[in-house]
Amino acid sequence: VIRRSRLERAEQLGVATVRLAAGQTQRQVAAELGVARSTLQDWRKPEAVGAPPAVLAAWMETPEGVRWLHQLVLAAHFSITLQGAAGIRVVCQFLELSGLSAFVGASYGPQQALNAALEETLVAVAEEQRAALARGMLHRDLTVCEDETFHPQICLVALEPVSGFLLLEQYAADRQAATWTQALKAALVGLDVAVIQGTSDEAGALHRHVEVDLGAHHSPDLFHGQHEVSKATSLSLARQVRQAAATVVAAQQVWAVERAAQQAYEEQSPRPCGRPPAFAARLQAAVSEVVQAEVAHTQAQARQSEARELVRELGILYHPYDLERGQAQPVEQVAQRFNGVWTQLGRIAQAANLPTRARERLAKAQRLTTQLLATITFFFATLQWQIEALALPPDLERALVEQLIPALYLERVAARSTRAEPRHRLRALSHQLLEPLRHGDHPLQALPSAERARLEQVAGECADRFQRSSSGVEGRNGQLALHHQGRHRLSDRKLAALTAVHNYHIRRADGTTAAERFFGRAHETLFGQVLQRMPLPPRPARRRPRPPKPPCLMPLAA
């Protein structure tokens, strides 16, 4: 028995409709199509499900209608289950509410099978695209951001921070250094890359994995240092502000009571016999208490504000280039600024009499200084050998090191700024550094356009080398948490499908996918490739009326 697909059936039904309209009999048309006459009659029988418009129902039986329905159903699965973090039952409900259940089997079983096929196809297409893009890939030195998340199984996640390309996303039995190294090396097979830097938290296994197993530089995540400072100061200082405010209120109430007592005494007529109470001394003491409480409150607020500003200062000073002038910051200058911050925080801790646990947190954050300074040293060292490898004349090399790379770095910092004022100021400073390079008499303008583009690309890679945050992988962990919350379990196939969607489908504002940014080449659309390989959606089953359920207390037959 030959089983025809839904599209083949629609195509043959279209041919049969034309021939029947031309006057041929059903028997003749069935013989020409190679089907039984009863099969042709069944094809032409109207569906007994739903009540869609006749025009729509007829169009759905055409090849164009079948293809459109195929694309629509797959788009629903793709968007709802792989990007919207919802389940298959939401897709079933969408098909019911939209009326598409008249043309597609909307029950859970058929849709679950279709969703499983979609995930398998996604993974296969992503692997093929990765292999195709890797064949023409130029060698790259990578920075890798790494972190673990828990579902509660351990999930290892690693991505390249500039492109956002997920290099690794898989479950593991543990999170030891050897496990990390084995998983990452397997993920990089076939890619012409070398990991020269890893950015992560301060987990010992990640340190060993990056520095010992990979022989790369470990760049600490600045946020973790800032977070330690915030935990050490925010709660205690906020408590002191609240207590000082309560003391001010209590002192003001005492002063008000004393003043009211004085007024009540003076309003008495006649006044009581004897010496009057010492209202002046009591009021003076109450006023003194109010002043002291207000001073203490002001000092507590000042310490709290200063601590917050110092946390921000850690983020402002930790850059290879000065954000005020756009010039390179020597490591000694950055170290001096760090020491100033730690000194001020120590003074606040002493003035506020912070508890021992808070002082230990401050010491823990301060210990990161050595690694932070080492990262700036690493940045300038790699920048130097990468620029020297270009073998440029001294004037061009100076232009790249002192103007182009700092300008591109400031441009990237401005793009990540959340406030308008620093964003506009940094962009203006970047433009100021680039302006001389754009003049026609500058040596850079004498180079061919292809050479200028190559130098700009190298300068951009140098600017991107400084990575002080692993927030990209933290954000990915948050997305995985949403998917896990909706399902309570992510299979290896589901996780691989989610990785494929992230790398080859999701596009930034510039219209590029993570894979295009990572490999430097465009690729065919993921959904288009999947659409060509996926089976057609199942037809709805003919509804059979169910017999009514008899009452539980129906009497038995005699």
PLM feature segments, named:
Residues 5-24, 70-86:
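Short, amphipathic alpha-helical "recognition" segments used to contact nucleic acids or chromatin
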Residues 293-295, 300-429, 436-443:
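Catalytic-core elements of nucleic-acid end-processing and repair enzymes
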Residues 28-33, 91:
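Short alpha-helical "recognition helix" segments of helix-turn-helix
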Residues 59-327, 334-344:
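RNase H-like nuclease fold core
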Residues 15-16, 40-43, 91, 147, ...:
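Mobile genetic element proteins and their domesticated derivatives, centered on retroelements
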Residues 281, 403-417, 421-432, 438-470, ...:
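C-terminal domain-tail junction helix/linker
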Residues 239-253, 462, 472-490, 505:
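Active-site proximal helix-loop segment of RNase H-like, two-metal nucleases, encompassing DDE(D)
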Residues 38-41, 109:
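Key DNA-contact positions within bacterial/archaeal DNA-binding proteins
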